[in-house]
C-alpha cells in the first residue's frame, strides 16, 4: 500500500472538510455558546490608556466603524450625514454612463438646498452648487461636500459617540481582542509548503471557524541562521499593511518551539502554478490584465507606506477562493529610511532590476516595477523575459542578459498595449521606468488597463475572470514537502526570550475584527437576548478565560 498517498489523502480530506465548516457545525456552536464579552467594569483602565483618533477608531477598525455607524443611526441629523456619504460612495463606484451622470446631478441638487439648523453642509457650498452649470463643476463640489461631511462627523458626532454606550461596547470588544493567543487557539491541518526557517500549514480558529495559513518559524533554526531581525521586520511590515491586495497578518504568537505568523489563507494556489501547471503555458489575457491590476494596487499600497517589496514574482502572488490575488511573502521587503537608497542586494534571479545587479547596488522603489514587467511577460509567454522555459542559464549569464539585452516579444498573445507596458516596466534605467519617471507617474493610467475600473476594483466589485475549483488542493502532496532536520546545539538565553515576547503580540486589530464580523460572532455576542456564556457562573466576568 502507498502509505504516502494515503497520508496525503487523509490530510487533504481533513483540510477540505475544514474549509467547508460554517457556523452551523455542532462543535463550533458549542464553543461559541461558552463565549462572553468582558464585563464593562474591566474597561475603565483601558478607556484611560486609549487616545481615540477618528481615523483609526471609526474608519480603519471594522468593529469601531460598525459601532460608530450604529450610534449615528440613533441621531437624525447624524444619520442624514451617513446617508449622504453612502450616496456619494455609490456614485463614485458606479459604472460610467448616463445613470452615473444623473446621480451626480441629484447629489449636486441635494447640496444646493438651503442648509437649515440641522444641516451638515455649509451655506457657501449650497450657493456654489446652485451656480454650477457643468458636470465637472458639480463633481468638484460633490467632492467638497463629502469632505465637509467627514469634517462634521469628526467633531460633535465623534465626541458624542465617545460618551455613548456604543463606545463602551467597543472597549469590551477591545479587551476581548487583547486576550493572550497560543497554539491552543487553533486547530492545525496539513502542511502547505516550507520556507527557509520552517513550514506553512493550514489552521482554523476554534471559536470562529475561520481558516488561515500559519507560517511557523523554528526558534532554534532562526537563532542558528541569524534570522531573528528578518522575521521581526516581516512581522512589523505585515502589521502596518492593510490592503485587499496583500496578505493580511491576523495573529503573531509563540509556541514552545516556533514563532508563528497567522495570515490570510489563499486556497487558489500561486500564479506560477497556474502559468505552468494548468492547461497551456501562460494565462489568458483577461486574467493577465486583472492580476496585473491587483498586483499594481498592492505595490502602490506598499510604496505609499515607504516599503520596497523586492520579491515580486508570480510564485509570490496567491489566489483566494474567489479568484482575487494578493502579494505574499514579505520576507525581503524593506522600509525606505529618509529617502535613502538601499544598498543590500536582495531578490530572485530573473526578476531583479539592473540596478540591484550592479557591483555597487543602489536602488529604491523602481525595482518593484521592473519585477512587474517580468511578471506580466511571464504570465503571457510562460517564460521570463531573459530566460526561456527550462533553459539552463548561469547566474552570471542571466545577470548579463538582464543588464544588457532588450526584451523580445515572440509569443503570439502579446498585444501592442502589453508589449508597450512591458517595455516601459523593463527599462534598464530606473528613471525611465513606468511608475518612476516622475513623482506622479501612475502605471494605472497606461492603456493596458483601459478596461479596468480601479475604484471598483479596490472596492472588490469587479468579478475575477477565473474562480479556483473549491474541491482542489493547490499545494504539493504532503509527502513531497521535505521535513526539516532537528537543529541541535542551540540554547536560548534571556535576550532570546525577550525577543520571542516582543514578536508575540497576539491579535492584529483590523484582521481580528474583520474575522469577528465575517464569522457572525459580532452579532451573536451583541445580541441582548443571548444567554450569558454557557449559563454557568457570573456572566459579568471576563470572557477571556473562556475563549482558550
From Swiss-Prot:
One of its GO terms (molecular function) is rhodopsin kinase activity. Autophosphorylated. Phosphorylation at Ser-34 is regulated by light and activated by cAMP. Keywords: ATP-binding, Kinase, Lipoprotein, Membrane, Methylation, Nucleotide-binding, Phosphoprotein, Prenylation, Sensory transduction, Serine/threonine-protein kinase, Transferase, Vision. It is found in: Membrane. Residues 186-449 form the Protein kinase domain. It catalyses: L-threonyl-[rhodopsin] + ATP = O-phospho-L-threonyl-[rhodopsin] + ADP + H(+); L-seryl-[rhodopsin] + ATP = O-phospho-L-seryl-[rhodopsin] + ADP + H(+). It is a lipid-anchor. InterPro entries: AGC-kinase_C, GPCR_kinase, Kinase-like_dom_sf, Prot_kinase_dom, Protein_kinase_ATP_BS, RGS, RGS_sf, RGS_subdomain_2. It is an enzyme of class 2 (transferase). It comes from the Eukaryota. ATP binds at residues 192-200, 215. One of its GO terms (biological process) is regulation of signal transduction. Residues 546-548 form a propeptide. Inhibited by phosphorylation of Ser-34. The keyword Membrane applies. Retina. Cones and rod. Its main location: membrane. Although the protein is present in a diversity of vertebrates ranging from bony fish to mammals, the mouse and rat orthologous proteins do not exist. Retina-specific kinase involved in the shutoff of the photoresponse and adaptation to changing light conditions via cone opsin phosphorylation, including rhodopsin (RHO). This is Rhodopsin kinase GRK7. The lineage of its organism: Eukaryota, Metazoa, Chordata, Craniata, Vertebrata.
